[in-house]
Amino acid sequence: MAAAVEALYVVLEREGAILPRQEGFSGVYVFFSPINFVIPPMGAVMLSLRLRVCIPPGYFGRFLALTDVNQPDVFTESYIMTPDMTEELSVVLFNHGDQFFYGHAGMAVVRLMLIRVVFPVVRQASNV
């Protein structure tokens, strides 16, 4: 019996959505902005990526800040993604600097890290 192929399935929902790129052979995927955007100084923007992902069973995902944006003051906020989530993905980007940040369509904006999890059974013990 052949082993099941694990894959991160991506549904491009709307115009401008860009397929993420895997970093090497890691469990990290780079996502790109579908539009031009501006983050004001000390401000934030909620950026829709215009896509959905299907996290493989046995994993959970988390967005990470993208350090190679070359803008040291721009950070991201995220939540844990599980295989049962189906909503379109958005990312909140914060600009903690004193200059406007100008992003463009096709620019890398966030990383998704997939983390393998195990589901051990619960057993009662008299001593640990």
Curated annotation (Swiss-Prot):
Query: What is the recorded function of this protein according to its Swiss-Prot or TrEMBL entry?
Result: May modulate tight-junctions functions of infected cells through interactions with PDZ proteins. E4 ORF1 has ben show for Adenovirus 9 to interact with protein involved in tight junction regulation. May play a role in mTOR activation by activating PI3-kinase, thus overriding cellular checkpoint for translation.
InterPro entries from the xrefs? dUTPase-like, dUTPase-like_sf
Q: Which UniProt keywords apply?
A: Early protein, Host membrane, Host-virus interaction, Membrane, Transmembrane, Transmembrane helix
**Complex and partners:** May interact with host PDZ proteins through the PDZ domain binding motif (PBM), namely host DLG1, PATJ and TJP2.
Origin organism is Human adenovirus C serotype 2 (HAdV-2)
Q: List the ranges whose topology is Cytoplasmic.
A: 1-26, 121-128
Identify the residue ranges that face the Extracellular compartment according to the record.
48-99
Q: How does it sit in the membrane?
A: Multi-pass membrane protein
Family label: Belongs to the adenoviridae E4-ORF1 family.
Q: Where is this motif: PBZ domain binding motif?
A: 125-128
> What name does UniProt use for this protein?
Early 4 ORF1 protein
Q: Which SUPFAM superfamilies match?
A: dUTPase-like
Q: Where would you find this protein in the cell?
A: Host membrane
Record field: transmembrane: 27-47, 100-120
Coiled-coil annotation: which residues? none
Q: What is the lineage of its organism?
A: Viruses, Varidnaviria, Bamfordvirae, Preplasmiviricota, Tectiliviricetes
Write down any Gene Ontology CC term. Answer: host cell membrane
